[in-house]
């Protein structure tokens, strides 16, 4: 029923913003313990990067909620739901790591969430093929972003690196699922606009 779905998505949104996310998988752990403690500067930098990643997961929840709600076929809804469920793991993992680093989520999370929700609705109104294409492009850009973070994170921060690496693996899977479900490639201007918006978000969330 539509009402039940609305209540469920509202609950998920509240959990995304309040940090009470459920995880279906445990937090990834490094294969080897860190060889050294993080310096204060390394902790600050790692926290900034993980805050950016947490914001990305807040946005992912909003995007996929909106796209699932506006999807026209059961198969598209299932694709968005599966991705959202795994992204909720990412949300919980990054929140957990921020606490370990004695840091906090972005102060602007309600703004990020609202913006992503609006974008998800807009993508959904263009039809399932475009909406799934938007998901595929989002996941490609997130994959590249996470690869960049793996090169930026301090070598000693094996805990954050384990989380980010598993997130990257999941994003690749989500992007492939969206393409396999019928997602079309977005035009270059749309992809460039998405990259520009992402850059604004990441540069702001690192500090705020």
From Swiss-Prot:
Its cofactor is Fe cation. One of its GO terms (molecular function) is metal ion binding. Fe cation 1 binds at residues 57, 87, 90, 171. It is a peripheral membrane protein. It is found in: Cell membrane. Its EC number is 1.14.99.60. GO terms for biological process: ubiquinone biosynthetic process. Fe cation 2 binds at residues 87, 139, 171, 174. One of its GO terms (cellular component) is plasma membrane. Binds 2 iron ions per subunit. Its main location: membrane. It catalyses: a 5-methoxy-2-methyl-3-(all-trans-polyprenyl)benzene-1,4-diol + AH2 + O2 = a 3-demethylubiquinol + A + H2O. Pathway: Cofactor biosynthesis; ubiquinone biosynthesis. CDD domains: DMQH. SUPFAM superfamilies: Ferritin-like (SSF47240). InterPro entries: COQ7_proteobact, Ferritin-like, Ferritin-like_SF, Ubq_synth_Coq7. Keywords: Cell membrane, Iron, Membrane, Metal-binding, Monooxygenase, Oxidoreductase, Ubiquinone biosynthesis. NCBIfam families: DMQ_monoox_COQ7. Belongs to the COQ7 family. This is 3-demethoxyubiquinol 3-hydroxylase. It comes from Burkholderia vietnamiensis (strain G4 / LMG 22486) (Burkholderia cepacia (strain R1808)). The gene is coq7.
């Amino acid at each position: 029923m539509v009402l039940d779905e609305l209540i469920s998505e509202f609950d998920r949104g509240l959990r995304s913003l309040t940090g009470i996310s459920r995880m279906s998988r445990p937090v990834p752990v490094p294969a080897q313990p860190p060889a050294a403690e993080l310096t204060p500067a390394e902790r600050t930098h790692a926290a900034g990067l993980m805050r950016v990643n947490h914001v990305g997961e807040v946005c992912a929840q909003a995007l996929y909620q909106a796209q699932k709600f506006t999807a026209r076929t059961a198969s598209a809804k299932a694709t968005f739901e599966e991705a959202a469920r795994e992204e909720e793991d990412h949300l919980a993992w990054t929140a957990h790591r921020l606490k370990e680093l004695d840091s906090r989520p972005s102060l602007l999370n309600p703004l990020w969430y609202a913006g992503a929700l609006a974008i998800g609705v807009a993508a959904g109104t263009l039809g399932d093929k475009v909406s799934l294409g938007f998901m595929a492009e989002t996941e490609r850009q997130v994959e590249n972003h996470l690869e960049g973070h793996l090169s930026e994170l301090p070598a000693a921060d094996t805990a954050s690196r384990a989380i980010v690496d598993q997130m990257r693996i999941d994003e690749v899977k989500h992007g492939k699922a969206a393409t396999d479900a019928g997602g079309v490639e977005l035009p270059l201007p749309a992809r460039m606009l998405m990259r520009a918006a992402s850059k604004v978000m990441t540069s702001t969330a690192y500090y705020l």
